[in-house]
């Protein structure tokens, strides 16, 4: 078998998430259906680096799959791209060794989250950013975001009931900025892995800090206490983007 690594992007609005699930549309299933046609009716399993949730978008999701023969990567990319639905784009495909695994090979993920704090809101962006119509202090959110950088137990920022036992992760970069073109707040996080809804819970906490309803020290308090109840709300997934995945 020959292994292929692909970088893909997608608009997550009409998907139930990346992972295949019964009676729901998923990115994994759509790509597998297309590969089935390209592989003479023989099923192909797609493995993704990140299992994004419903409504979450991606610029740089990475997948891998195996085919029984070697094909020209660009011709394969073109065939897969043109036969996939319009809300999925196959950015690139390359040949990799059988040791490569999109999910388990060591990598750094970068997520971005967009917040429209304008009044009135921009209805054209309702599927691509959350609306937060309250005053925000960029400086307070930037200061609090720095507390998240480093190796920590992120139990307080993950969804309750998760089956993952080891909740220690390393965040190498956390920032908050304003996009000069749109005026949207851009929350960016890079790390070696993220827990279920971790990014959305961190953004929810930073927004409360930026609005003055939580102290700047709250991010550190949540980390130290490991208490989800002390963090902010889980923001909606439509503002979240899997921006990039870099492998070692």
UniProtKB/Swiss-Prot annotation:
The keyword Nucleotide-binding does not apply. InterPro entries: PsdUridine_synth_cat_dom_sf, PsdUridine_synth_TruA, PsdUridine_synth_TruA_a/b_dom, PsdUridine_synth_TruA_C, TruA/RsuA/RluB/E/F_N. Substrate binds at residue 111. The keyword Nucleotidyltransferase does not apply. It is an enzyme of class 5 (isomerase). Its EC number is 5.4.99.12. Coiled coil: none annotated. Keywords: Isomerase, tRNA processing. GO terms for molecular function: RNA binding; tRNA pseudouridine(38-40) synthase activity. It catalyses: uridine(38/39/40) in tRNA = pseudouridine(38/39/40) in tRNA. One of its GO terms (biological process) is tRNA pseudouridine synthesis. It comes from the Bacteria. The active site is at 53 (nucleophile). Pfam families: PseudoU_synth_1. HAMAP family: TruA. PANTHER family: PSEUDOURIDYLATE SYNTHASE (PTHR11142), TRNA PSEUDOURIDINE SYNTHASE-LIKE 1 (PTHR11142:SF0). Homodimer. Belongs to the tRNA pseudouridine synthase TruA family. Formation of pseudouridine at positions 38, 39 and 40 in the anticodon stem and loop of transfer RNAs. This is tRNA pseudouridine synthase A. It comes from Streptococcus thermophilus (strain ATCC BAA-491 / LMD-9).
């Amino acid at each position: 078998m020959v292994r292929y690594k692909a970088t893909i992007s997608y608009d997550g609005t009409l998907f139930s998430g990346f992972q295949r699930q019964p009676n729901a549309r998923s990115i994994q299933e759509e790509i597998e259906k297309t590969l089935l046609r390209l592989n003479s009716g023989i099923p192909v399993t797609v493995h993704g680096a990140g299992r994004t949730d419903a409504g979450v978008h991606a610029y740089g999701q990475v997948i891998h799959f195996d085919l029984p023969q070697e094909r020209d990567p660009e011709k394969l990319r073109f065939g897969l791209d043109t036969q996939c639905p319009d809300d999925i784009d196959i950015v690139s495909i390359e040949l990799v060794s059988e040791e490569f695994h999109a999910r388990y090979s060591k990598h750094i993920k970068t997520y971005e989250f967009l917040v429209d704090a304008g009044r009135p809101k921009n209805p054209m962006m309702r599927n691509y950013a959350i609306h937060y119509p309250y005053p925000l202090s960029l400086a307070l959110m930037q200061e609090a975001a720095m507390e998240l950088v480093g190796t920590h137990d992120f139990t307080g920022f993950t969804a309750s009931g998760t089956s993952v036992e080891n909740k220690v992760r390393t965040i190498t970069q956390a920032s908050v900025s304003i996009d000069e073109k749109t005026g949207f707040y851009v929350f960016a996080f890079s790390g070696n892995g993220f827990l279920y809804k971790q990014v959305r819970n961190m953004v929810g906490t930073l927004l409360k800090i930026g609005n003055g309803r939580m102290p700047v020290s709250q991010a550190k308090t949540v980390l130290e206490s490991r208490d989800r109840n002390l963090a902010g709300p889980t923001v909606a997934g439509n503002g979240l983007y899997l921006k990039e995945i870099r492998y070692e």
